[in-house]
Amino acid sequence: MEDFVRQCFNPMIVELAEKTMKEYGENPKIETNKFAAICTHMEVCFMYSDFHFINERGESIIVEPGDSNALLKHRFEIIEGRDRNMAWTVVNSICNTTGVGKPRFLPDLYDYKEDRFIEIGVTRREIHIYYLEKANKIKSEETHIHIFSFTGEEMATKADYTLDEESRARIKTRLFTIRQEMASRGLWDSFVSPREARRQLKKDLRSQGQCEGLPTKVSHQTSPVLITLEPMWMDSSRMATLRASFPKCLEK
């Protein structure tokens, strides 16, 4: 799985995911499923905001790569990935400026057009169950929830999908491609099932003579995703390195 992640995700995303895991005492070489999940979630958050701007009339427009966007405002503020203190500073500033209610938990994005925070979810499980879990945790009408699955399904608050169909299809296609590439390498089953992942991990470590002292239970603790995002990702050109640059997964 580690090789897959390094081959199939933008190197900058991989580096940031590694920093986050190491800060919380997790090893990307061992917690490889979590490594893949963090990279996937971050990529979806950036894809969600990519190309979307607000013009001088307050209208949401899509600007393709190469077109001038110097005088336009990004439609979405990326909160996910910032340092936690800075993230809350941004959230507080948005709330003070717009008058929207402050969320209980840090959301992933803020939509300047709809004036609402957005929580992005990417699930390997049944999408309705995952959505309900998110909604039960957040318990706020101020935060809009949008869930994507690896099978092309999506679910959003009040069936309001925020983005145009083409932008959402781009995200779904990327997720489906990740799933297909994992499956072709025999990685998908372990990515979906913690028990299968545990079995595969023990098998891999045993073959390397590293199984001694391994915990007997899978950790279900979720790391805060990408809180060490570099400031350079938050300026006006933060998406430049990602636009139309998703690496093609290489066969081993």
From Swiss-Prot:
Give the chief site where it resides: host cell
Q: Where is this site: Important for efficient shutoff activity?
A: 202-203
Keyword Cytoplasm: yes or no? Answer: no
Subcellular localization, as worded in the UniProt entry: Host cytoplasm; Host nucleus
Source domain of life: Viruses
Tell me the domain comment: The probable endonuclease active site in the N-terminus and the basic amino acid cluster in the C-terminus are important for the shutoff activity. The C-terminus acts as a nuclear localization signal. The C-terminus is recruited to host protein complexes involved in nuclear Pol II RNA processing.
Q: Which family does it belong to?
A: Belongs to the influenza viruses PA-X family.
Protein name, UniProt field: Protein PA-X
Q: What organism is recorded for this protein?
A: Influenza A virus (strain A/Swine/Wisconsin/1/1967 H1N1)
- The gene for this chain is PA
